[in-house]
Curated annotation (Swiss-Prot):
ZnF start-end (NR C4-type): 53-73, 91-115
Native source species: Mus musculus
Region of interest (Modulating), residue spans: 1-52
Protein family according to the UniProt entry: Belongs to the nuclear hormone receptor family. NR1 subfamily.
Keywords for the protein's UniProt record, in alphabetical order: Cytoplasm, DNA-binding, Metal-binding, Nucleus, Receptor, Transcription, Transcription regulation, Zinc, Zinc-finger
Protein name according to UniProt: Thyroid hormone receptor alpha
Amino acid sequence: MEQKPSKVECGSDPEENSARSPDGKRKRKNGQCPLKSSMSGYIPSYLDKDEQCVVCGDKATGYHYRCITCEGCKGFFRRTIQKNLHPTYSCKYDSCCVIDKITRNQCQLCRFKKCIAVGMAMDLVLDDSKRVAKRKLIEQNRERRRKEEMIRSLQQRPEPTPEEWDLIHVATEAHRSTNAQGSHWKQRRKFLPDDIGQSPIVSMPDGDKVDLEAFSEFTKIITPAITRVVDFAKKLPMFSELPCEDQIILLKGCCMEIMSLRAAVRYDPESDTLTLSGEMAVKREQLKNGGLGVVSDAIFELGKSLSAFNLDDTEVALLQAVLLMSTDRSGLLCVDKIEKSQEAYLLAFEHYVNHRKHNIPHFWPKLLMKEREVQSSILYKGAAAEGRPGGSLGVHPEGQQLLGMHVVQGPQVRQLEQQLGEAGSLRGPVLQHQSPKSPQQRLLELLHRSGILHSRAVCGEDDSSEASSLSSSSDTEDTEVCEDQAGKAASP
């Protein structure tokens, strides 16, 4: 006898009735329906609070396959289509069953027919591959909306006011007029020969070693580099309005930071070099052995990280202004005025960043962190070596002075100034093993000759003849003023 294909009888859905008791009633694990535990309290915003399933009348949970249904009818319809079960469904009562939330599991055929009758769409049920593709599309749409929202938020951020634009233009012009070689530095730079500064060869009195040839090259550019920082500051009205004493303290504190920033933004990843003063391209070891020690690592790392920001001249200029107007310097008189000036530059800086609309997420806070890195990495790197003669950075004393960390500040410089006569000439014999002159003595003489050590030079009151003459009494008085300010700045 030919056996008829088995049919699924009414109420025998294997997925919905797998946990039935002998009396035909559905068991509930742990006394609670899993569906209700997972969906409890969830109502989509487009549904009314007590909206019912159009198939069985149970509480609806959403819009499924073009109809508002409960989770049970949604799952039943999906399984039926995915597994192609509807040809096997049958009804004992001539397809006349009433489907509600109590009887819905007793006749699969009538339940399926009602799903079709109320408008549930079979073509919206996806197989596994289509479902994966749909989820991918959903994720893409979410990402697109996220980007659109970010663009809208950027467009809504405030841009510079007319007053801030004036501040920005002045700072930008001050930077461009004092930035050696400008945007043409790559074409005009000269690489320091590889045989210079590759190995520390001369022992200094403090036990460190330095390549004097590299040091000699650096001393040729240090005076104009410091002078350009001073000129930049003097072109800012907010700085020029400060007392002369505060101007000197601010310049002493920021000189190394600004010169390091100017070198860092001229980092070239192809040659792995920094271009100092817009003209001399040096490698890490050359900078380190030429007198800068471990700080060279901090400047190179800063250059690498800043290269991703693609800063323009205005952003570099405003960053320098923020570094200049720092109230962290000891001995300041007009702290409130300086703090307000820094806040004005910070606000203009933030609004200008909004104006440029960088593609880097969270560009502004990241850039602020870099500003703090300029200070912390340069000023406090190697703090464990604070007791050494080279100061808190673990750098040779001549290296610290070479790039303006102290300018006229700290016991190293004061000790050297005691070796200078009133006319600026060196006292005492020059040791033969220290080259014709000690690097410290050479640098100090350079700073005296350039007028960097004189308060009148900083405040714009110097006479050209007085600035060039170290033998005049006025220069000696100015030097004493700077020494006094340096002592205040160095003391806590």
